[in-house]
Amino acid sequence: MGRKSKKIIVALALLSGISFFLFARADEEEKYVRLVKAQSVNIITDADGKAFRKAVDATFLHNGTLLICDTAYWRVDENIINAKGNVRLSQEGTELTSEKLDYYVNDNLAQFRGGVVQLRDKENNILRTHFLDYNTADSVAVFSKGASMKDKDGQIIESLDGTYSSKAKLFTFEKDVNMFTDSVFIKTQALDYHTDSQKAVFRTYIDFWKDDNMLTASSGWYERNDEIFFFTGDVHGITDKQETWCDSLYFYRIPNNVLMKGSIQLQDSLHNTTAVSRYLFYEDSLSTVTLRKEAAVAIVT
């Protein structure tokens, strides 16, 4: 083996050793919480004789997450931080604020209870609740007992339970879900909201209201950027003059047009008309209905 080959092998071995050291050091750092700065730190003993550190104007670092508060009581033996006053938890664009939290270092868990906690993500969506757990290792929040999320455009989604994943850019809402967007109100039991695409996915049965119009369906979605609603599965729509049934329906909100597909039935009490087809398109600007594919119309006189 030549001298040049030996040098390459030695260099690779050194690089491997350095890489292993860096990864090992990163893993080691994640295990420990650091007090980055504080105005003052005092060691205090409680009634049970256990010592803890009291830090004023404290900033902690753990899992790449900053924990900032007015006062922190750090129970070192149990590895728990009780933070109080202007509490802020910040991690890669996700920020949680409240008046208090308990941080369980060994579990990577920030636990908010009782007071209002606000979660703001990179897209400036704001969620408020009273019961929330945030895992700093996987960047996932779990909330319960009621929450409300408002996006940057004013759209509101409410539910009893749910989750938020910073990495997936995803809110999930479960149980008694209500969605308010301008003049539209939707009620369901399970909704996923993708913050990067501003798309809401309704995973269970839907009740939809717009002005005096009502619609029900098995599932669907809403793309806010394009202002398109899609409903599928036993779609049933009711207006003051019409009633419709179909397999799937697209509602184009800006032009206020409607496209129906599948097994379509239309009953129009204003014109005493009944129609069936496999395709129906309603164009609002012209107030016209176009029927295609196995279309038939009956007029009651």
Q: Which residues does each PLM region occupy?
A:
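Bacterial Sec-dependent N-terminal signal peptides
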Residues: 1-30
